[in-house]
Amino acid sequence: MSIRFGVSPIAWINDDMPELGGDTPLSTVLSDTAEIGFTGIELGGRFPRDPAALHNLLGSYGLDLVGGWYSGNLLTQDADAEIAALQPHLALLKALGTDVFVFAETSNAIHCRKEIPLNDTPS
């Protein structure tokens, strides 16, 4: 078995807080990723969602898609609705040949809501 290493684009661009790395071009993220020696990258918010466009973009840097984060909402919608909502994301991952799906329940997350202290317990 061989091991390949991928990286998350959050090291350059923060999808939750765009002011952190918001001016970093996607081309910089991808060229740095390849130059560092990674062979893949996790799906990020600025990546195209069209499978062919994403495949071509990553391929132009010699990269593969290694997985993709998904912010779930099971506390605010039922499981059937959540499963239906994540289908486009799963289809994109499958089309790009990755079998890594990162699911995080984020319905009541407060990390992006600056008006709420981080020590408040989600309700």
Regions found by a protein language model. Name each.
Residues 1-100, 122:
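N-terminal pre-domain/capping segments
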Residues 111-113:
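Short, helix-capping/interhelical loops that line the mouth of catalytic, cofactor-
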Residues 115-123:
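Glycine-rich tight-turn/loop motif centered on a GG-T
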